[in-house]
């Protein structure tokens, strides 16, 4: 009898916790036929609503349901990491509680594992129902990552992924504080099968990911899996030094040959302002990487557990 660990991060999801459970257990017949036992791990990321109480109600009905509740909101990345740490399964799957990750795909995903794959991942082939601006910047992010990172991150990739214990242990070996799981999946390697499906809208409630949070998350991903921004900052510094050197030679030659006085305060102010802006931009890039390093060396725990059942 093999064990499947289902990891479900939750943040203020009282409306969807029960719906997810009832949709997931529709696979029970498949699990029995294939001698698969299940543990369902709800990872509460410091919810302020009745998410914890809803999970406890499910626990009274089904002992396969477990709860790990954080002391505060640490973020989805911390919740996924905690779920992987707490899991005991021979196979582990990460799913969103809002049912945008269809549990009905699990039998198909297990079929691919039997073919010898270490991981079965999912990606959306459309973004129907999303705001156009959000979809545009999401595609832009994936195209950018493809160009500047050596780690492959598929366009439209979801966190919904079924993995073997060997792959999970490899991910857990990466104990970095600043986590970008989509990149970590690609970095550890292993043979992966991709399943594509149309975008599924939330069953209830509203997304907790606004544009600003997604923007910060994308910056974390770039800083975690690419050093190209640092190279760009260095290149811009070299180019401006070269420009300044050429401009100095131009002024000297103009003075010697034509005797023109050095003038043009407006243009000089514009050049200084532009150079200062570029310097601050490059300093911001360096600061982003320095901040990540600072958080790593402090070695604070990725999450703190308040309650566990």
What spans do the regions from the language model cover?
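Hydrophobic helical membrane-anchoring modules
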Residues: 143, 180-309
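Short, well-formed alpha-helical segments that are part of the catalytic scaffolds
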Residues: 13-30
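Cell-envelope/extracellular polymer assembly enzymes that use nucleotide-activated donors
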Residues: 3-5, 39
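A conserved acidic beta->alpha catalytic loop
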Residues: 44-52, 99-100
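Short beta-strand/loop segment that forms part of the nucleotide-sugar
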Residues: 32-46, 68-69
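Donor nucleotide-sugar binding loop of glycosyltransferases
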Residues: 13-16, 47, 102
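Acceptor/aglycone-binding surface of glycosyltransferases and processive sugar-polymer synthases
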Residues: 57, 64, 68-72, 76-86, ...
